[in-house]
Amino acid sequence: MNFKYIVAVSFLIASGYARSEENDVQSLSQREVLEEESLREIRGIGGALLSAGKSALKGLAKGLVEHFANGKRTAEDHEVMKRLKAVMRDLDSLDHPEEASERETRGFNQEEIANLFTKKEKRILGPVLSLVGSALGGLIKKIG
């Protein structure tokens, strides 16, 4: 009788342990799925913010170009306007990567293409921000 009792209790313990292991595996896979979804959402938000930032910079650059185009310009203003036009061309090429320098991207795989444009964005955003900052500083000095 004791042997049957020991076997029954052992079986219950083993089945309970197996169920808990199964639940742990399921919860891990659910957590992984949730983490993946969270990462996708974060990437989507980051892409949207980058797109909004590019649009804002393009709008600001257009406004500055129009301002410099309509007034009297010094040599420095002329140089700033040329830089702003170049920045606007670069920002447009970021929006339409398939049209931007096909020679550059010919023969590369998709990951290398993405890396090229990420590097281009980084290379452009730094000077753009400093250029916009200096242009705004110049405008504020003239107004003030």
Swiss-Prot record:
Residues 1-18 form the signal peptide. The modification Asparagine amide is found at N70. Expressed by the skin glands. The modification Isoleucine amide is found at I143. GO terms for biological process: defense response to bacterium; defense response to fungus; killing of cells of another organism. Residues 19-43, 74-123 form a propeptide. InterPro entries: Bombinin (IPR007962). Keywords: Amidation, Amphibian defense peptide, Antibiotic, Antimicrobial, Cleavage on pair of basic residues, Cytolysis, Fungicide, Hemolysis, Secreted, Signal. It is found in: Secreted. GO terms for cellular component: extracellular region. It holds the Pfam family Bombinin. It comes from the Eukaryota. Maximin-z shows antimicrobial activity against bacteria and against the fungus C.albicans. It has little hemolytic activity. Maximin-Hv shows antimicrobial activity against bacteria and against the fungus C.albicans. Shows strong hemolytic activity. Belongs to the bombinin family. This is Maximins z/Hv. It comes from Bombina maxima (Giant fire-bellied toad).
